């Protein structure tokens, strides 16, 4: 059963996973491994050098039926969030897309000269290439730029 209210630092990490096992992917992207026993979210994050507020902002965003995180934005660690997003890209590019391609090959008949099957595979490969290009651009440019903005002094501070 999925929790309907927000998780807090004092919630047990095991309860979080029992409530919603899909949050295991979020944990993985923050480099949090299993084996936390009865520890709270805050304890697990602290022991692994993960910003707890950022972790919870992402977790609570994932479980809500909303596409807004306005309440949590002021509390997140930008470097932690950028690392999470890079890990999400890595998972999608290096696991999801190859898995989809493999299943696509299994589903279509590639054993004969089937032009439609070839075109489907060609279209998917072009799509995957565009997705990779987009995510690589974000990883190399957008996330780097955001981190630079985050660490640079604001114009107000330079007076």
Where in the sequence are the language-model features?
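Hydrophobic/aromatic-rich structural module bridging two neighboring secondary-structure elements via a short loop
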Residues: 60-89
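Single conserved hydrophobic/aromatic residue that forms the stacking wall/gate
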Residues: 150-159
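N-terminal alpha-helical targeting/anchoring segments
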Residues: 17, 24, 31-46, 52
């Amino acid at each position: 059963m999925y929790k309907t209210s927000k998780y807090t630092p004092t919630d047990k990490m095991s309860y979080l996973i029992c409530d919603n096992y899909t949050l295991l992917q979020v944990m993985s992207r923050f480099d949090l491994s299993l084996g936390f026993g009865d520890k709270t979210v805050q304890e697990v994050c602290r022991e692994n050098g993960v910003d707890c507020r950022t972790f919870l902002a992402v977790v609570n965003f994932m479980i809500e039926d909303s596409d807004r995180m306005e309440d949590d934005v002021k509390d997140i660690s930008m470097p932690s969030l950028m690392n999470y997003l890079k890990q999400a890209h890595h998972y999608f590019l290096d696991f999801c897309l190859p898995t989809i391609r493999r299943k696509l090959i299994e589903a279509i008949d590639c054993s004969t000269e089937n032009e439609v099957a070839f075109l489907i595979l060609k279209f998917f490969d072009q799509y995957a290439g565009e997705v990779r290009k987009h995510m690589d651009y974000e990883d190399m440019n957008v996330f780097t730029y955001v981190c630079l903005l985050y660490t640079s002094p604001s114009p107000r501070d330079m007076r």
